[in-house]
Amino acid sequence: MNCCANLSNLVIYRALLSDPIVNALRRPKEFFAPELEGLLLVAAEEKGLTGIIPLEYLLSAIVHEQNVFSAVAEKNDGKIGEGLARAAAHDIVIMREFVDDVFNRYKNHPLLGNYTPTVFRPLPGRSKLEKILLHAEGDADGRQAVRILCSYYNDYGYGAMLDNGAFAWNGELEYLSGTKNYSDMTFDKLYGYDYQKEELI
């Protein structure tokens, strides 16, 4: 079974299978190449991806996905149970094969192999992701990668938590919405909270 077909054996990261770009990367012979390139260029500009765009898209999609592993690891300070760790390791081994295949197919691509977007937005902790999925020597079973990814989710979160430095309450819609551009607030800029500042300092 090749790595693209093997992706359908994912247990935790199954939502990746419904991503149109991931599906196009899985079935390169079924998609018109310029159509896929167009989708990837749009994604690169919207997400601020740079470098080998299909690879960067996959790394971003993997850590942005909300699933039981990402939610439990973030909620429990990076600690998960043995059963969940085995399931995550299973998926990581499968994703490694696919990520490696995509890397090799696109690393020398004239358009997508070394792309620079209009506005670059670095993916937090990208070097950890590269270590987990591309440079995994000595971790054939994926267990070390699970520990690193638990730490990643604990440090950075997943989904919207990765993309926003701050959050504000949207009273009309009654939910937290991400704020990408916010001013840095320091104690000397706060007025009327002298008692609270004393307690915190």
Language model features: what each stretch is:
Residues D19, D141-Q144, T186:
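Poly-acidic low-complexity segments
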Residues M1-G138:
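Intrinsically disordered, low-complexity N-terminal extensions of AAA+/P-loop NTPases
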Residues G113-L176:
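Interdomain "pre-motor" coupling segment immediately N-terminal to P-loop NTPase/helicase cores
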Residues L133-A136, Y175-E199:
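Dynamic helix-loop-helix/coil hinge segments at AAA+ ATPase domain boundaries and subdomain interfaces
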